Every structure is written in structure tokens, then in C-alpha cells.
Amino acid sequence: MLNSFKLSLQYILPKLWLTRLAGWGASKRAGWLTKLVIDLFVKYYKVDMKEAQKPDTASYRTFNEFFVRPLRDEVRPIDTDPNVLVMPADGVISQLGKIEEDKILQAKGHNYSLEALLAGNYLMADLFRNGTFVTTYLSPRDYHRVHMPCNGILREMIYVPGDLFSVNHLTAQNVPNLFARNERVICLFDTEFGPMAQILVGATIVGSIETVWAGTITPPREGIIKRWTWPAGENDGSVALLKGQEMGRFKLGSTVINLFAPGKVDLVEQLESLSVTKIGQPLAVSTETFVTPDAEPAPLPAEEIEAEHDASPLIDDKKDQV
């Protein structure tokens, strides 16, 4: 009965306005009130502030600053084996496994379309048919920055407008095509393990989705698909990120979906649905053996990232996708 009521609210409540209100409130400096809200949040969700670079809640001017708080480097060591891809986020694995042609498992008895997840981009979908996927849910208590599973060269980013359903166990089991319906940012990378997609999925109360190379992607919420592309390799304007490096963040949190090409990686055997994830721990292993890591690409300076973002053309029409 209670679950039915909660599901009904998902369809009745004005999720967009609630999200805008939450984003507005979380960005405001309210002095003692901000600290009180943070303290209550920490207590209710049992947030481990000892891991944060700034463990004192009084040091955060806004709730958003607290929510995207950086962690101390030593609390998330990155596995250095060149054959290992690491977990991109703190959270819990919702589902994982093989992509069956165009079908991805959402919950027991519920699948959704790979092509729909990728906003109808069938060429991108072809890269991952019969490949591997991992869906990681970030709860409110988790660290909400997202990191790279491996070295990667950014090739494409697509913003897809959509619904703002909550993303949790209840909605995954009961809202059809949940991840293909919600707002999301799709990031496609070239890696030594083949193409990899890392998808940041929005939800109710997720105030914004950001990337390190382009800043805030949403809001504003304009209701149109947007697409950006970047050059390959070491060409001028390329964006290179290292294994374990931050690539994005949620202000209030949601879900990360990783897609890997067929035959390129095997997921770590002990991982299963509801496994706890920590950034830097093994997620998958290459099906090939790398004796030594390839030369690591140098991270792009911040000013060049900003310049590239300003120069990248926007394509606002769905039909212009490749």
C-alpha cells in the first residue's frame, strides 16, 4: 500500500518545479540555517565526514558545496593495474551484465532499450550491442563526484532532456524504461579497452549535472537534445582524462550507467546487484593483457577546457545526431 502511494506521487508531483526549488535552495548561503540543514542531513543519512577534505560542516557556505564535497585523496586509492577498470562512483550496483542486442536489464523482469537510452543514436548503440553494462546508484549519503574507470579521450557528449523520476529500487522495478525516460548526459570516450560510454542520469531533486570540461550541462532545461563533439587523440582541442580522475558530478544525486563494447572487458566475478561500490576499486578486467600501461594522456588545462567548450558547436536538433 505504501509503495503504491509512493509510486503514485511519482506521477502526480510537479517534479520539475520541485527540482528547481531544491536547486535554488541548495545554492543559497543561509549561514546558521545552512549548517543546521547540513548537520541534520549528515545525522539522518549517516554521512562519514571523516573522509571529506573539510570535515567541519561549518566550512560549507551552501548545501551544494557540502553535497559535492571533495574527499581526501588517500581514502579512495585507485587500482594501478593497467588491465583493471575501476569503479566510477561510490554507491550500490543496481544491475550489471550483458547487453542482449538492444536490451539492458533495469530490474528483474524489466528491460529497456539501449538505443532509447542513447537518444535514438543507432550508430552509437551499434558500438555496445552485446557488450557489457553496469548501473550504479548513488544514494544521498554517498560522495557525488563521478570518476573515470580508465584513461579516456572524450569524443562526444549528448544532453537528453527527459522526465525526473526518482531513481531507486522501487522506481526501477515499477517505472517502465526509467533510465531511457529520465534526463541524462551521455559521454562517449575512446579508451584502450574500446569505446566506453559513461551516462549521468538525472532524477527528482537533482539540481544539476556538471562535467569537468564543460561545467554545468543542466540547468537550464530547454527541452531539446544538444550534442557536442571533440577531436580524437592528441589533436588540438582534445580532452584527455586519466583513470581515477574526476569527470563529472551531481548536485543531489542519481545514477551512473557504464557501457562497454562486446568482447573487451569482463566484469569482476564477485560483483552482483546490490554490491557496494567505492571509487578506485576493481570493476572490470581487460580481455587482453597489457604488460605496461600505454602512455598516459596529459590532462587538459582548465583554461583550454573552457576555450574548447566555448568553441564547440551545438546541435540542437535530434535529426543532426550521427
UniProtKB/Swiss-Prot annotation:
InterPro entries the record matches: PS_Dcarbxylase, PSD-B, PSD_type1_pro
Record's keyword annotation contains Lipid biosynthesis: yes
Pathway: Phospholipid metabolism; phosphatidylethanolamine biosynthesis; phosphatidylethanolamine from CDP-diacylglycerol: step 2/2
Enzymatic class: lyase
Cofactor details (free text): Binds 1 pyruvoyl group covalently per subunit.
Known catalytic reactions: a 1,2-diacyl-sn-glycero-3-phospho-L-serine + H(+) = a 1,2-diacyl-sn-glycero-3-phosphoethanolamine + CO2
Site (Cleavage (non-hydrolytic)): G253, S254
Residues at the catalytic site: D90 (charge relay system), H147 (charge relay system), S254 (charge relay system), S254 (schiff-base intermediate with substrate)
Region Disordered, annotated ranges: 293-322
GO BP annotations listed: phosphatidylethanolamine biosynthetic process
Cellular component aspect of the GO annotation: plasma membrane
Compartment list: Cell membrane
Comp. bias regions, Basic and acidic residues: 308-322
Post-translational events: Is synthesized initially as an inactive proenzyme. Formation of the active enzyme involves a self-maturation process in which the active site pyruvoyl group is generated from an internal serine residue via an autocatalytic post-translational modification. Two non-identical subunits are generated from the proenzyme in this reaction, and the pyruvate is formed at the N-terminus of the alpha chain, which is derived from the carboxyl end of the proenzyme.
Cofactor annotation: pyruvate
Chief location bin: membrane
A UniProt-annotated Pfam family: PS_Dcarbxylase
Assembly and oligomerization: Heterodimer of a large membrane-associated beta subunit and a small pyruvoyl-containing alpha subunit.
Function statement: Catalyzes the formation of phosphatidylethanolamine (PtdEtn) from phosphatidylserine (PtdSer).
NCBIfam families named among the record's database cross-references: PS_decarb
Protein family per UniProt: Belongs to the phosphatidylserine decarboxylase family. PSD-B subfamily. Prokaryotic type I sub-subfamily.
Protein name per its UniProtKB record: Phosphatidylserine decarboxylase proenzyme
The species this protein was found in: Escherichia coli O127:H6 (strain E2348/69 / EPEC)
Organism classification: Bacteria, Pseudomonadati, Pseudomonadota, Gammaproteobacteria, Enterobacterales
